[in-house]
Amino acid sequence: MAEYDLTTKIAHFLDRHLVFPLLEFLSVKEIYNEKELFQGKLDLLSDTNMVDFAMDVYKNLYADKEIPHALREKRTTVVAQLKQLQAETEPIVKMFEDPETTRQMQSTRDGRMLFDHLAEKHGFRQEYLDTLYRYAKFQYECGNYSGAAEYLYFFRVLVPSTDRNALSSLWGKLASEILMQNWDAAMEDLTRLKETIDNNTVSSPLQSLQHRTWLIHWSLFVFFNHPKGRDNIIDLFLYQPQYLNAIQTMCPHILRYLTTAVITNKDVRKRRQVLKDLVKVIQQESYTYKDPITEFVECLYVNFDFDGAQKKLRECESVLVNDFFLVACLEDFIENARLFIFETFCRIHQCISISMLADKLNMTPEEAERWIVNLIRNARLDAKIDSKLGHVVMGNNAVSPYQQVIEKTKSLAFRSQMLAMNIEKKTNQNSRTEAPTWAAQDSGFY
């Protein structure tokens, strides 16, 4: 289902190395021409040092042609550069292998103290930091992400936050951990990078907006793989004004991922409250972005169009199956979406035909009855099933005036936040196209 594929939009905000997993996924799904995907990989590889990978892709794309001489020459050059950097970095690496240095790194949080210790014991010099950074970046460009992560960790521990390479080293460390699928480490790096961006007083508002936009896209890898990711994505994307503003201004397509995280969230009470806030954002941005996932929420909670919601739910399956980040959420999404339809339908109708519910839930009457029985048992819903008549009879779920007041006042802060962001959004729109992108960089993480 190429119509709803977001790979091109998302790739615009990713480092080129992070795009490769997305292209591999598309190859398996076969929704694009295979040769076009191979050509896309080759174009991405042209500005990296992964020459062997580029040669393999070239062979797949042009089986009847010889490997270009330029590629072979580039391989020779890369190997020579790697050997030279290894020789320059070897004495530095030996310092970090020293047991006493390892203990110091684990026990001290002060990079200056560690630097002074290395300078005193091993003759460590300031220029070694630049050498370490260049070697880490070169390792990354060659596809050796474990080596890059290790050296970038050493670099981060030693440099002050004001160092010219400090921020880009954080991006590189995060990318390396993502590509190695070390989700706990990636979550730590994501948090550290977010704090650095949010506390940066030097960057202009436009630069900060761009950095947050990159962070939003890179974070998708972490949030949809880490056990706590679906909670964290809601907190960051929906309830932190600067990030919600970035989504609305620069990348409204991210609403697909926020909506999926809300629908698949395992905390039922939190999910119901968050949905109300999410619906407001989806309504507000419906003129700039919509897909079956956001339209499902709109059909159900804005229009109360159950037939439309059922149709969109079927379309959601195709979208989820073909989305790199969301494919693992399919079962949770369908199960919870059916629950939402059921809950909303029950609020409107006192007595419901099981066959009608089955139709709304895209199930057989027998499946629907079993599903509702389990739902009533597990969720303790105030309802009874009349198997003889084939009806579900709802209990009295009247909301107390006290609860109504609480629900109405809960959204006041959120509405104020939305008003403030709308004003800021209008201010930023004129300069939207001027923002730099990672895709414009030559290679690597900066």
Swiss-Prot record:
Residues 425-446 are annotated as: Disordered. One of its GO terms (biological process) is formation of cytoplasmic translation initiation complex. This is Eukaryotic translation initiation factor 3 subunit E. Component of the eukaryotic translation initiation factor 3 (eIF-3) complex, which is involved in protein synthesis of a specialized repertoire of mRNAs and, together with other initiation factors, stimulates binding of mRNA and methionyl-tRNAi to the 40S ribosome. The eIF-3 complex specifically targets and initiates translation of a subset of mRNAs involved in cell proliferation. Residues 222-399 form the PCI domain. Component of the eukaryotic translation initiation factor 3 (eIF-3) complex, which is composed of 13 subunits: eif3a, eif3b, eif3c, eif3d, eif3e, eif3f, eif3g, eif3h, eif3i, eif3j, eif3k, eif3l and eif3m. Belongs to the eIF-3 subunit E family. The keyword Transport does not apply. GO terms for molecular function: translation initiation factor activity. CDD domains: eIF3E. GO terms for cellular component: eukaryotic 43S preinitiation complex; eukaryotic 48S preinitiation complex; eukaryotic translation initiation factor 3 complex; eukaryotic translation initiation factor 3 complex, eIF3e; nucleus. SMART domains: eIF3_N, PINT. PANTHER family: EUKARYOTIC TRANSLATION INITIATION FACTOR 3 SUBUNIT E (PTHR10317). The keyword Iron-sulfur does not apply. It is found in: Cytoplasm; Nucleus. Keywords: Cytoplasm, Initiation factor, Nucleus, Protein biosynthesis.
